[in-house]
Amino acid sequence: MFVLLAAPAQAQGLAGQAQIDAAGDLPVLFDARERLARPDVSEILRLRFLTTTDFPPFNFTDQTGRLAGFHIDLARALCAELGMETKCQIQALPYAQLQDALEAGQGDAVLAGVAVTAALRQRFVFSRPYMLLPARFIRHRETQLPGGDAAALFDRPVGVIAGTAHEMMLKAFFPDIKPVTFETRETLLAALKDRKVDAAFADALQLSFWTQSPAAANCCRLFDGPYLSEKFLGEGMTIMLGPQGGTLATALDSALAALSRNGRLEEIYLRYFPSGLY
């Protein structure tokens, strides 16, 4: 799938409604006092973003078959901020093909939530983070706890998926909590729903959507947090560029900072996460 990035007419209205429905809570990742240089991008003939269609609400195809999602709207906003609306394109590929396509010059930037690793840094250039994905607790609504923060879970059973960064993070951050491990997210959430554990600790994005799903049956709600850790959860979501993309990465950093400061980044976030992650 391949499309030009023309901004949809309804975008501003959706963002305005989200602003009313939820308080903004997107962490600020760019210091207001920081001045980021913006290279001249006027000679760049086109800016080709690569993404996928299997990571809702970040990138997916809508009911009309068009690319949609947080990343699609972010790409449009970045292009507008850089004055490159008519030069921007976006193409969807299978996730497994993104790195090879970028190295082969089939695109200029990957906007698909790729996790930064030391190995990838040897092959690609990355922008600054535009979003951090936190860990959160979730509790059953009928479970009585002696407080409103994580201390209320001390000496209590809290479920977590075995062998994950969240298990290591739970043990490191909260040694007084009794971790109960599960092999899968499904068995973890089933145990929480059946009140076999007092709470669970996992990825906030997955928990947020589960609490609103029919499967949860309004049993549970997010509790305390958010908890962020580069050591356990990584650097956050960034844009991945080819090895010669340093100048473009600097330009995108400058544009991301501008979107953060003028509120546009938060508008896009609230459109797709009206209940918040933080």
Give the predicted meaning of each segment.
Residues 11-278:
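Proline/Glycine/Serine-rich low-complexity intrinsically disordered segments
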